[in-house]
């Protein structure tokens, strides 16, 4: 009997020791679930590059290879454990996947979301579950303009600056549009982008005529009728915030029919299709990258390290905005957690680290970023625009004739909605 009890006791102790080993191991990691497009038309030029940027930066963080001040291994001293899910499927599906990551997979942080529709759906659930959530890319200003959140942050600026800078670029270059057409995807991102650009044009170029407004369905892929309508209207400037596979298709179809020869075109967020289109990318197109990313990135140690090393690792010729956006989000986490430990000497709870995230300023491969809006939950940064050209030596499409705009020049002050700020004549802007 005693022998049997001894064996049971020994077995129990082994199981108990394994439990503590597992628990200890779990405490040495920070677990992150990430949603990005892994399939469909938004994947190849946007979702996958975002994944690559995050993978590269998290791996570099784990190995302590990021330049100072990020050169200590891990986030808050913990190894980063991360996985990806597919953002394809719509907002309802993403809400379900979000709950699964939080309630079943027990993540410490949720990150990601490219679609503005998804970004409008996720925050309420994050607040309900008290889950720290980092929105990486989506551009609609409505996220923090229409509500306030405790557990949600957005590390990328919203779309207003893309379009304000677009109008300012025209003014700086002496381009005075008389007739403008627009083609934007028919959901929050496209609608908000066009409203911001149209409002900015009204201020800088009063009297300009809007001759065609096209809102094709997201992921439509075919734009023959929209292109025909714009060509008939004969605009001297075309605005588009389209992105991903939609933008690739529009450019190829429009170029074939001479759209880019007859009108100046402004693509507010178009840099990410330059690698895939290559020689098929028309020259002379004004292009933004939702910030100073890729060819538009500043000449800093961190920016150059990131661009050189990720290009080498992936065997690519240029970086694009989704890669930079992923890196920005990863470094935001590291800066906040590291700062919390530096001041408190213990790994912070979610409630504690939020205090360090609010209003945070951090350096990125795209220059400094500031949590300046949304009660310290919405980032702003500088903006840059360039013009497409073919580089014969590098054999790639690139951006030249670059203009930079300070963050305070193209982003509204705290507490003011972007469109209201635009309509009010950009009061308080610092250009």
Regions of interest found by a model, annotated:
Residues 30, 361-431:
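Solvent-exposed, acidic/polar segments of extracytosolic/periplasmic ligand-binding ectodomains
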Residues 16-25:
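Hydrophobic h-region of N-terminal signal peptides that target proteins for export
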Residues 1-8:
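N-terminal secretory signal peptides that target proteins for export/translocation
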Residues 52, 92, 107-215, 262-288:
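Extracytoplasmic ligand/sensor domains, especially the bilobed periplasmic-binding protein
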Residues 25-34, 71-79, 171-178:
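Immediate post-signal peptide segment of exported/extracytoplasmic ligand-binding proteins
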Residues 33-57, 61, 86-91, 114, ...:
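Extracytoplasmic "Venus flytrap"
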Residues 29, 45-50, 64-145, 155, ...:
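Beta-alpha junction/loop-to-helix N-cap segments that form part of ligand/metal-binding clefts
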Residues 51, 244-247, 294-360:
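Extracellular/periplasmic ligand-binding modules, especially the Venus flytrap/periplasmic-binding
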């Amino acid at each position: 009997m005693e022998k049997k009890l001894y064996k049971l006791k020994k077995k129990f102790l082994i199981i108990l020791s394994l439990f503590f080993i597992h628990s200890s191991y779990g405490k040495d990691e920070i677990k992150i679930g990430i949603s990005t497009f892994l399939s469909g038309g938004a994947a190849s030029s946007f979702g996958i590059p975002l994944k690559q940027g995050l993978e590269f930066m998290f791996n570099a963080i784990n190995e302590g290879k990021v330049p100072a001040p990020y050169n200590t291994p891990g986030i808050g001293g913990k190894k980063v454990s991360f996985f990806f899910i597919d953002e394809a499927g719509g907002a309802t599906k993403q809400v379900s996947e979000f709950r699964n990551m939080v309630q079943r997979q027990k993540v410490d942080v949720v990150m990601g979301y490219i679609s503005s529709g998804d970004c409008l759906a996720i925050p309420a659930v994050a607040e309900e579950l008290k889950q720290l959530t980092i929105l990486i890319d989506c551009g609609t200003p409505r996220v923090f303009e229409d509500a306030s959140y405790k557990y949600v942050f957005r590390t990328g600026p919203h779309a207003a600056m893309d379009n304000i800078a677009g109008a300012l670029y025209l003014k700086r270059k002496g381009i005075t549009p008389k007739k403008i057409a627009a083609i934007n995807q028919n959901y929050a991102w496209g609608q908000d982008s066009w409203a911001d650009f149209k409002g900015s044009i009204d201020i800088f170029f009063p009297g300009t005529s809007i001759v065609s407004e096209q809102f094709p369905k997201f992921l439509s892929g075919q734009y023959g009728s929209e292109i025909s309508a714009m060509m008939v209207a004969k605009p001297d400037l075309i605005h588009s915030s389209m992105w991903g596979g939609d933008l690739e298709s529009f450019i190829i179809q429009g170029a074939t029919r001479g759209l880019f020869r007859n009108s100046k075109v402004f693509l507010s967020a178009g840099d990410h299709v330059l690698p895939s289109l290559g020689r098929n990318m028309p020259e002379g197109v004004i292009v933004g990258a939702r910030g100073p990313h890729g060819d538009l990135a500043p000449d800093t140690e961190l920016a150059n390290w990131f661009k050189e090393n990720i290009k080498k690792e992936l065997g690519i010729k240029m970086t694009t905005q989704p890669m930079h956006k992923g890196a920005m989000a990863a470094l935001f986490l590291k800066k906040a957690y590291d700062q919390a430990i530096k001041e408190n000497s213990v790994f912070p709870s979610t409630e504690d680290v939020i205090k360090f995230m609010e209003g945070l300023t951090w350096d990125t491969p795209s220059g400094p970023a500031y949590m300046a809006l949304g009660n310290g939950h919405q980032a702003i940064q500088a903006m840059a625009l360039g013009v497409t050209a073919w580089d014969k030596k590098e054999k790639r499409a690139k951006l030249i004739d670059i203009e930079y705009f300070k963050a305070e020049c193209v982003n509204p002050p705290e507490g003011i909605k972007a469109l209201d700020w635009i309509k009010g004549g950009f009061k308080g802007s610092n250009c």
